[in-house]
Amino acid sequence: MRQKLVIGNWKMHGSLAANAALLEGIQAGAGVARATLAVCAPFPYLAQCQALLNGSKVAWGAQDVSAEARGAFTGEVAASMLGEFGCTYVLVGHSERRTYHGETDQAVAAKALRALEFGIVPVVCVGETLAQREAGETEAVVGRQLQAVLEALTVEQLGRVVLAYEPVWAIGTGKTATSEQAQAVHAFLRGQVAARDAGVAGRMAILYGGSVKPDNAAELFSMTDIDGGLIGGASLKSEDFLAIGNA
């Protein structure tokens, strides 16, 4: 049975004082959480996460990583640097990166590969827009996004990846895919991975990332192929994040 995983994506939120209070609250309840908990913080706060969470039951990670190992890439952050700050996870291909920064499927795959090279688990995000869903293109879109990763990674590397399905139309909009809609896409994604390796597919955590809240988490997480959540707004309140972790 796959262990539930709940990752908080703070996006571009936080301050040293607010983070300290948030992490203290999360740690206080992490010991009894049913899911494994992690937070993905903005780069400047990774040292704070390392200092406050080291030795706790809460893991931490980053929200992006460079596909390059090192060099003259101003503004980029290397996977080796994330490793020095104890990052377990890194998000790659989040819809906001794809939309606002023009990240291609191939760039996302390259970032995932680089993270794995330095022992960091890439959380590969895929998802469709409202227009794509209404046009019946959901499987074609997420399948294409996933295929780039499947082609770039070996089976062994794929076994160290976490997937996250984030319907773009349900992020920050208050809209949520029904549990059945989400399950259908998760099952499709697992099937695509299974076509490469059934064992990896059976073990892979596939998270749901579309406006998960304390009042809908339990129903979503009860679905066969939903193994937890990638949490946005609700991860900024310790009580909400813990409630989701206990769903």
Swiss-Prot record:
Q: Which domain of life is it from?
A: Bacteria
Q: Name one GO biological process term.
A: glyceraldehyde-3-phosphate biosynthetic process
Chain ranges passing through the membrane: none
Q: Which reaction does it catalyse?
A: D-glyceraldehyde 3-phosphate = dihydroxyacetone phosphate
Show the disulfide pairing.
none
Which residues does the Swiss-Prot or TrEMBL record annotate as the active site? 94 (electrophile), 166 (proton acceptor)
What Gene Ontology cellular-component terms does the record carry? Answer: cytosol
A molecular-function term among this protein's GO annotations: triose-phosphate isomerase activity
Which pathway, metabolic or otherwise, does it act in?
Carbohydrate biosynthesis; gluconeogenesis; Carbohydrate degradation; glycolysis; D-glyceraldehyde 3-phosphate from glycerone phosphate: step 1/1
UniProt entry keywords in alphabetical sequence: Cytoplasm, Gluconeogenesis, Glycolysis, Isomerase
Q: Where in the cell is it found?
A: Cytoplasm
> Which of this chain's residues are annotated to bind substrate?
9-11, 172, 211, 232-233
So what EC number does this one have?
5.3.1.1
In terms of NCBIfam families, this protein maps to:
tim
What functional role does this protein have?
A: Involved in the gluconeogenesis. Catalyzes stereospecifically the conversion of dihydroxyacetone phosphate (DHAP) to D-glyceraldehyde-3-phosphate (G3P).
Similarity comment: Belongs to the triosephosphate isomerase family.
Q: What quaternary structure, including any partners, is listed in this protein's UniProt entry?
A: Homodimer.
Q: Supply the name of the protein.
A: Triosephosphate isomerase
In which organism is this protein found?
A: Cupriavidus taiwanensis (strain DSM 17343 / BCRC 17206 / CCUG 44338 / CIP 107171 / LMG 19424 / R1) (Ralstonia taiwanensis (strain LMG 19424))
